[in-house]
A protein has these predicted regions:
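N-terminal [4Fe-4S]-dependent radical SAM core
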Residues: 16-21, 53, 179-219, 261
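Glycine-rich beta-alpha loop elements in corrinoid/cobalamin-binding modules
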Residues: 60, 76-204
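Conserved SAM/AdoMet-binding glycine-rich loop
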Residues: 255-377, 383-388
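Flexible glycine/acidic-rich beta-alpha junction loops that bind and position SAM and/or redox cofactors
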Residues: 101-105, 263-277, 336-350, 383-391, ...
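N-terminal pre-triad scaffold of radical SAM enzymes
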Residues: 2-12, 200-235, 248, 252-255, ...
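Catalytic cores of alpha/beta
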Residues: 154-162, 314-318, 387-402
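Radical SAM enzyme core and accessory elements
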Residues: 1-31, 36-37, 225, 437-457
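A solvent-exposed, charged loop/short amphipathic helix patch at secondary-structure junctions
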Residues: 20-51, 100-128, 346-355, 432-445
Length: 457
């Protein structure tokens, strides 16, 4: 297939965040007392390049790159700072987005607090507004946007037309991306918004392995989630776990590219290989033994408190394997609420295999085990969920008191309508109550308490 295709992302995504994914959350903040150039250098410096091509790139972009190469396209992934060098001959440009308008929970919360637009929204717009892209559009370049953040375009309906975006792809694109880019390089009309249904999601054997390194060695170990929380969009996707050899092959690609460590990515790493909410001891241990043998360091993207609490002995065994080469590791976790009543309403299966009304105890047990085994969680709370009552907020404040001795960061995030709750109202700053302010203060106090120890690790 002919046609030159470029893939890129804005500079807040084309960074390795100084080899700390947690620093990537700095892109969610708006401009502040730190000068912009210094803030960028501190939190999202540009990735290393070889001849204008990044030595690593966001994992989702690498998957699309692999699929297009598999289908015979001429494709290059380029850094935004080096687009000018390659875009002259390009017929189509694919752009990966995570939080293009700063409407995600973390960025919208920080935007409210600091009253400014987040960096990630500013740099996405600046990318599309760059002279090289504007010039390429005039000669017929097609722009295709995809990634986890495309849902935000529904709140900015005129943006795509204003900035010359020809097609927005929503969902897992492996099955369709080839035909859309083929139409683009042929100069054909593209669908303005292409939504991929659950039925059209790729099967395991249809998902290609990455062929070039991903940022910070991140590799997917599975897709989808079986818990069905109403506020989450991932749970709308079918659950699939990659076989270990597929995961290890992608780790080899990253190691060959200079990434000695890896981030195992799934919505719940503890459930690797399981088709329900009970961890599979054999598969989880076998995977970690193989990964630690290859890598200098391992961390997780996400895991569930219920999965940890369900199998304390298994979790301790996994921790022992991981800590052979490192003193600690991290993961993002969803605490969401301290209220059993709210848990029953918006996330009845999040506590499985325990009952929803046991949720506060599940949180305390899971986080206690993490503390004992040196997993340092970055926990999130939902502020302003639909049907939230004052009593629910009080219960969450009480839970924060119970967690004060757990080594962790806990971040309150304003409710954003996603998943099955996408028709609900956004939580607005005018809805902030004294109780909400008390909860935010508790989280800040908790973070300050643990900051010194976490920085020293």
């Amino acid at each position: 297939l002919g046609g030159r295709i470029l893939l890129t992302a804005d500079c807040t995504l084309m960074s390795d965040y100084r080899h700390s994914e947690f620093l990537g959350f700095g892109t969610c903040a708006p401009p502040n007392f730190i000068p912009d150039f210094l803030y960028k250098w501190l939190f999202f410096p540009p990735i290393n390049n070889q001849k204008g091509l990044p030595t690593s790139a966001p994992y989702g972009l690498r998957k699309i790159e692999a699929q297009l190469l598999k289908e015979g396209f001429s494709v290059k992934t380029v850094s935004p700072d080096n687009l000018r060098k390659y875009i002259v001959q390009a017929q189509a440009l694919g752009i990966h987005v995570m939080d293009p308008f700063g409407l995600g929970p973390a960025s919208s919360t920080l935007a409210f607090i600091l009253k400014k637009e987040p960096f990630l929204a500013q740099y996405f717009r600046a990318l599309l507004d760059s002279p090289e892209i504007r010039d390429a559009k005039k000669r017929g370049l097609k722009i295709i946007v995809g990634g986890p953040g495309v849902w935000q375009f529904q709140y900015r309906p005129k943006f795509a037309e204003k900035y010359g975006i020809d097609c927005i792809i929503s969902g897992e694109a492996e099955r369709v991306v080839g035909k859309i880019f083929q139409a683009a390089v042929r100069g054909q009309q593209l669908p303005q918004y292409y939504e991929i249904s659950v039925e059209d999601a790729p099967k395991l054997e249809e998902i290609p392995d990455i062929v070039c390194p991903s940022v910070n060695g991140l590799v997917e170990i599975g897709r989808g989630c079986c818990r069905g929380c109403s506020f989450c969009s991932v749970t709308l996707r079918p659950l699939r776990w990659y076989p270990a050899d597929k995961i290890l092959h992608e780790i080899d690609v990253n190691i060959a590219g200079g990434n000695a460590g890896t981030i195992l990515h799934a919505e719940d790493v503890m459930l690797y290989g399981s088709n329900n909410t009970i961890p599979d001891d054999k598969k989880l241990l076998k995977l970690h033994q193989a990964v630690v043998k290859k890598c200098e360091g391992v961390t997780w993207s996400h895991c569930s408190l219920a999965g940890v609490a369900a199998k304390p002995k298994l979790f301790a065994q996994v921790a022992e394997i991981i800590r052979q080469k490192q003193s600690w590791w991290g993961a993002e976790i969803g605490i969401e609420t301290g209220s059993p009543e709210l848990a029953k309403k918006i996330m009845p299966a999040k506590a499985n295999p325990f009952k929803a009304e046991e949720w506060p105890q599940v949180v305390k047990t899971g986080m206690g085990l993490m503390h004992d085994n040196w997993l340092i969680p970055a926990g999130t709370l939902i502020v302003g969920a639909p049907e939230e009552t004052e009593e629910d907020v009080i219960k969450t404040i009480e839970l924060m008191d119970d967690l004060k001795d757990v080594r962790s960061l806990i971040v309150p995030l304003f409710f954003v309508p996603m998943g099955r709750l996408k028709g609900e109202e956004w939580f607005k700053e005018t809805q902030m109550t004294n109780l909400h302010q008390e909860l935010l203060a508790k989280c800040l106090e908790h973070g300050i308490r643990w900051a010194d120890e976490l920085i020293d690790l």
